[in-house]
Structures are given as C-alpha cells and as structure tokens.
Design a protein with these regions (language model features):
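Catalytic center-proximal scaffold of phosphoryl-transfer enzymes
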Residues: 1-251
Length: 251
C-alpha cells in the first residue's frame, strides 16, 4: 500500500482554494492479495537487486504468485484539501477485504508500505493488532532509495564507489543491522567533514532509518517467507492511475 508514484492530473480545480488547473495530486493505492511464504536469504535479495541488466530476469519456478489480488485507488480530498477521505476509503476497503478472507485465523497479515507515518497510523486504526497478527514491513525499495541518497553525499553519482557503498549498506540492512548502518553513516560524515547542508541531509536519512527501524527486520521477514517489496503496487501505479483515472477524464 502506498502513495502512487505516477501522479494523476486534476483539471478545473477550484482556483479560490489556491489550486490551479492542471496541478497534480497524489493518489493512494492499496492492494490485498494472498500468497504462500517464500523463503529467501539476504544474499538472494542482494543478488537480485544488483543483478546486471543483461542477466536473466526469469523468476524461480518455485516462487509463489499472488492469488485473489484486488487493487483499489482513491484520489479524494475534503473541502480543506486534506487527504483523509482517500485514506479512510482505502484502509476501510482493505480491512473489509481481509475480514472477508478470514485471514486473521489462517495466516499473518503483512502490511507493506512506504515510510509515511500517517499511513502506518491508519494501519493501526483499521487493522488493529488485537484482531490481526500484523507484520509491519517498510518497502525495501524505499529504504534502498535513502541509501542511494546517502551514497551521493559521499561519492559522485554514477560512480563505482557509490555502487559499492550502496551494496554494502543494503546488505547490512537485509541482515537486520539498521542501527549499524546509521552509526556507519555518521562516522563517515565526521571523517569526511561534510558541509552543513550535507550533514542536514544525512540527518534526515538517519532519522528516516531510525523511525522505521522496527519495520526493517528484513532478516526475520525473509526467514518467515514474507514479501518485502511492493512490486504489486508498482504495477498498479501504471495500470490504475495512468490508465483508468486518465480515461475517466481526470487528465
């Protein structure tokens, strides 16, 4: 579940509220599906992330596929411009989907999202742990994007040094060593004597990692066979938001 990477344009917004025609708003997408556990190791994931483009991208034959996948998108605001209506719509729908599947009695519920705190709070409200065995997981690809930002504070963009830096830190994250990554970044900042602006950027990165550390026990998630990245939603961002919303006259 995540904010859509592809933004749907809204035409004819009320200019009295400061919105101009053609300005963009962020849709919220949710997906509910059932999938069998798939055990991997940190090295399995690391190899997949850093595989060369020309290498085979075929999925292992024993990898389970999502079943009964339902996707829903909402692009809604109240009169004050708040996104609360779309959050209520998507999380209410997901809670109903989960209840209808009787998943609570059969298997754990994985809540896989980006790092937006308001979405995690909504998850607690609509999918409370007293009713569901919830495993909160930060989408690995969002965590990796922050490691790339950190790499570019120390190394030139596109350099081999930046790539090696990212691979090293991502492996630590996959091993469940988030605090070690944070300490390493801060030590490097001290040694490299980063500028004030870069230090501020680094603290934002470290803050993101620390705030989400409880959702980054990837070594445990992999051993349990849980999904750790929202590829299902990445596809939905393209098909639901770009295709269906734009066809309905929203562009």
């Amino acid at each position: 579940m995540r904010q859509a990477a592809e933004q749907a344009r809204i035409e004819g917004a009320d200019s009295d509220k400061g919105m101009r025609s053609g300005s963009k708003k962020m849709a919220l997408l949710g997906s509910v599906y059932t999938i069998d556990p798939y055990l991997r190791t940190p090295d399995d994931v690391l190899d997949a992330l850093f595989r060369q483009p020309q290498a085979s991208t075929e999925q292992p034959s024993n990898r389970p596929k999502p079943c009964f996948k339902h996707v829903r998108a909402a692009l809604m605001r109240d009169v004050a411009g708040s996104t609360t209506p779309q959050v209520e719509t998507i999380f209410g729908w997901m809670a109903q989907e989960v209840s209808e599947r009787a998943m609570a009695a059969q298997r754990p519920l994985v809540l896989l999202m980006d790092g937006q705190e308001s979405l995690w709070n909504a998850g607690l409200e609509y999918l409370p742990e007293q009713h569901f065995e919830v495993a909160e997981i930060l989408d690995l690809l969002h965590a990796v994007s922050y490691i790339w930002k950190a790499a570019h504070l120390f190394h030139p963009s596109g350099s081999g040094a930046a790539l090696r830096f990212v691979r090293k830190q991502v492996k630590r994250i996959l091993l469940g060593e988030v605090e070690r990554v944070i300490r390493s970044l801060r030590r490097m900042a001290t040694r490299r004597e980063l500028s004030k602006n870069r230090l501020e950027d680094l603290e934002q990165i470290c803050g993101y990692l620390r705030n989400n550390a409880s959702r980054m026990a990837y070594d445990e998630y992999l051993a349990a066979g849980y999904p750790i990245a929202s590829g299902v939603i990445e596809g939905a961002c393209r098909t639901v938001v770009n295709d269906r919303m734009e066809r309905s006259g929203m562009s």
